């Protein structure tokens, strides 16, 4: 009788082990998500990431799955500590949103063998996250938000036919901003523009930086996805609005919430969703080292009638079918 009971118990244990081994999340998958700062485009990335994870069965608190989200509040030290925290806890994967989060995550995780999936990184090669976009060959891959530079310059030219000087405010330590600035400098002349750029080191210099650009005689501001600037964009518009200088955003939320008149916008929810799918693939066994970076560059023109009115601008005929945001 004891032998029969032992056999039954053994079979029961085998059944339980088989049932618990069905998926990664059932084994207790730990996913760390680090967002650099609390601003709209990065919030949208996070939403897309969480949507993808949840749809694929990775839900915090269910089937042993843990998803720990940290917002770095735009502070470099906070992001570094969060990255190391994920590594110390032995997380299975780290998802990092924006270049200033991705870089410390990769630095902390690479020796531990923890894969990093980044989102909204404009220049992954320049940031040292991958060796190439097609074949990363590191412990990181993810999605890149390549701005549609030509479409943005065409939009600015259409809205302000007489404009000559475009002001760009950027953070000197943000690799994504340096890459974007370089592209605008290369292309601006094709549209009759000159780029006047002003670098800053941190958020405390946004006010003085935009003041310097206004003093230099700019006709408008073209905003990047620079995290310091976007996170403090009310400081920018507090100076440009009274000076009668329109701002053009790098994505929709900068038009809807921050006062920009128009933008060739990327869909950051969709970008985040693709990031989440890539993380799911890696958790399922895909090799992060050979997974190509996914680049999003398709854009859509959007505008705000209310913001345009502040500067006496009218909607150009070429943009009559553009989408209005309110």
Please describe what each predicted stretch is.
Residues 1-30, 55, 59-60:
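Short, low-complexity disordered leader/linker segments with a strong preference
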Residues 27, 123-165, 266-286:
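Hydrophobic alpha-helical segments within soluble ligand-binding/sensing domains
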Residues 28-56, 68-77, 173-177, 227-231:
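Extracytoplasmic "Venus flytrap"
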Residues 31, 49, 141-191, 291-308:
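An alpha-beta-alpha
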Residues 57-79, 138-140, 187-203:
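Short beta-strand elements in bilobed, periplasmic/extracellular small-molecule ligand-binding domains
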Residues 68-131, 226-241, 245-250:
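Beta-alpha junction/loop-to-helix N-cap segments that form part of ligand/metal-binding clefts
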Residues 175-245, 249-251:
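Pocket-lining segment of extracytoplasmic ligand-binding domains
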Residues 280-326:
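Hinge/cleft segment of the Venus flytrap/periplasmic-binding protein
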């Amino acid at each position: 009788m004891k032998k029969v009971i032992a056999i039954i118990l053994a079979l029961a244990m085998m059944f339980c082990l088989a049932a618990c081994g069905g998926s990664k999340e059932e084994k207790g998958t730990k996913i760390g998500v680090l967002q650099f700062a609390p601003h709209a485009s990065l919030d949208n990335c996070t939403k897309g990431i969480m949507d993808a994870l949840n749809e694929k069965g990775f839900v915090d608190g269910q089937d042993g799955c843990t998803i720990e989200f940290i917002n770095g509040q735009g502070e470099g030290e906070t992001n570094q500590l969060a990255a190391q925290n994920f590594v110390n806890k032995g997380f299975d994967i780290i998802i990092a949103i924006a270049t200033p989060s991705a870089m410390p995550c990769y630095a902390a995780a690479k020796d531990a063998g923890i894969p990093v999936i980044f989102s909204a990184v404009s220049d992954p090669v320049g940031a040292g996250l991958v060796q190439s976009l097609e074949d990363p060959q590191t412990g990181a891959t993810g999605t890149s938000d390549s701005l549609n530079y030509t479409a943005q310059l065409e939009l600015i030219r259409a809205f302000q036919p007489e404009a000559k000087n475009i002001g760009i405010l950027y953070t000197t330590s943000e690799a994504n901003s340096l890459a974007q600035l370089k592209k605008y400098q290369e292309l601006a002349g094709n549209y009759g523009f000159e780029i006047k750029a002003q670098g800053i080191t941190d958020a405390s210099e946004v006010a003085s930086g935009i003041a310097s650009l206004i003093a230099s005689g700019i006709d408008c501001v073209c905003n990047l996805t620079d995290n310091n600037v976007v996170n403090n964009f009310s400081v920018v518009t507090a100076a440009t609005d009274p000076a009668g200088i329109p701002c053009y955003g790098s994505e929709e939320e900068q038009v809807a919430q921050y006062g920009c008149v128009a933008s060739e916008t990327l869909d950051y929810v969709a970008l985040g969703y693709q990031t989440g799918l890539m993380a799911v693939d890696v958790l399922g066994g895909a090799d992060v080292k050979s997974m190509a970076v996914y680049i999003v560059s398709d854009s859509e023109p959007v505008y705000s009638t209310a913001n345009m009115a502040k500067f006496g601008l009218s909607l150009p005929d070429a943009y009559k079918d553009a989408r209005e945001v309110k």
